[in-house]
């Protein structure tokens, strides 16, 4: 798992928990499947599409940069 993938997974989980949001709620707000959110958070998706990361960032009220910071 790359450093970027690990940071993205860790930061999505951090922002989601900070917002007291379940993976299911995040998936609905982002218009993605629960499976997609779970795979990205676990690091199983090594290179998610920029559009997907943008939708997650918008749902979490943060920027893509905040999700990628190490």
Where do the model's predicted regions map?
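DNA major-groove recognition helix of helix-turn-helix/homeodomain DNA-binding modules
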Residues: 51-66
């Amino acid at each position: 798992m790359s450093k970027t993938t690990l940071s993205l997974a860790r930061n999505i989980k951090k922002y989601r928990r900070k917002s007291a949001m379940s993976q299911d709620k995040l998936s609905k707000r982002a218009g993605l499947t629960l499976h997609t959110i779970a795979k990205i958070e676990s690091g199983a998706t090594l290179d998610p599409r920029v559009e997907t990361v943008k939708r997650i960032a918008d749902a979490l009220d943060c920027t893509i940069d905040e999700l990628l910071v190490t």
